[in-house]
Design a protein with these regions (language model features):
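Core structural elements
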Residues: 1-2, 188-192
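Phosphate/diphosphate-binding loops
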Residues: 155-183
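NTP-handling and nucleic-acid-processing catalytic cores
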Residues: 1-141
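Short, intrinsically disordered, charge-balanced linker/junction segments flanking boundaries
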Residues: 193-197
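Active-site cavity-forming subdomains of large catalytic enzyme subunits
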Residues: 142, 163, 185-187
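A glycine-rich phosphate-binding loop feature that marks nucleotide/adenosyl-phosphate handling sites
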Residues: 15-24, 179-189
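The substrate-binding groove and active-site-proximal loops of carbohydrate-active enzymes
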Residues: 112-114, 146-156
C-alpha cells in the first residue's frame, strides 16, 4: 500500500506483447524477431477543411482503424504549417489531429506516421504524452472487434487485405514499396506477436 501512496506503483492500461494463439502475454525477452519481406504503404489522409491531405507511411494498414492521431517531427519544415490541423481518418471517417512529436523520424517514409496507441508500443507512449484516446480494434485472438467497422470479425491479415482494397477503391492508397523489417514472434508457437492493451 505504501508503494501505491508513494506513486511507485499504479493501476492502469499498459501495452504488452500478446500471442494471439497461446492467448498469453510474452515478455520482451521471450519475443523472437525474424526479418521478413513486407511492404510499406503510403496512405492519403485528407484535411478536414478540404485544403489538401497528408500522406502517412505504415507497414500495418489494418491498424489504421484505431488511429487517434497523425504525428510529424516538430523540426520537419514540410509539416510546420499543418501541426494542429485535423484530418479525416479514411474508412472510419473520424476526425483526428496532426501532432508534433520528437519520436517521429523525418526520413522514414513520408515523415508522417499514423498513431495507433492500442497496436504499437511507441504509439502507446506517444498517446500518453499527448493525451490521446486509445481505441482497441482487436480481441485476444487478433480478430478485429466492433471498433473496426466493416472489418469486424475478420482476422488481422484478412482485414489487412480488405482495408487495402477499400483504400484503393476510395483513392486513398498512394503507393506500396517493398520493405524488410523485423517481426516479433512468440517463442513457443512462432505466431506473430500483437502489441495489446
Amino acid at each position: 500500500v505504501r508503494l501505491y501512496h508513494d506513486g511507485l506503483i499504479y493501476r492502469g492500461d499498459y501495452i504488452v506483447n500478446w500471442c494471439p494463439r497461446c492467448h498469453t502475454a510474452i515478455s520482451d525477452l521471450e519475443v523472437e524477431f525474424e526479418e521478413e519481406a513486407g511492404a510499406l504503404w503510403d496512405i492519403r489522409y485528407p484535411y478536414v477543411d478540404g485544403t489538401g491531405e497528408i500522406v502517412v507511411a505504415t507497414t500495418r494498414p489494418e491498424t489504421m482503424l484505431g488511429d487517434t492521431a497523425v504525428a510529424v517531427n516538430p523540426k520537419d519544415k514540410r509539416y510546420k504549417d499543418v501541426i494542429g490541423k485535423k484530418v479525416i481518418l479514411p474508412l472510419v471517417n473520424r476526425e483526428i489531429p496532426i501532432i508534433a512529436d520528437d519520436y517521429v523520424t523525418m526520413d522514414f517514409g513520408s515523415g508522417a506516421v499514423k498513431i495507433t496507441p492500442a497496436c504499437d508500443p511507441a504509439d502507446f507512449e506517444i498517446s500518453k504524452r499527448h493525451n490521446l484516446e486509445i481505441i482497441k480494434i482487436m480481441d485476444g485472438s487478433a480478430v478485429i472487434n466492433e471498433n473496426g467497422g466493416r472489418s469486424a470479425g475478420q482476422d488481422r491479415y484478412v482485414a489487412r487485405d480488405n482495408v487495402l482494397k477499400d483504400l484503393e477503391r476510395g483513392g486513398y492508397l498512394v503507393r506500396k514499396e517493398p520493405y524488410t523489417h523485423n517481426v516479433g514472434k512468440c517463442y513457443r508457437c512462432k505466431t506473430d506477436i500483437e502489441p495489446f492493451v
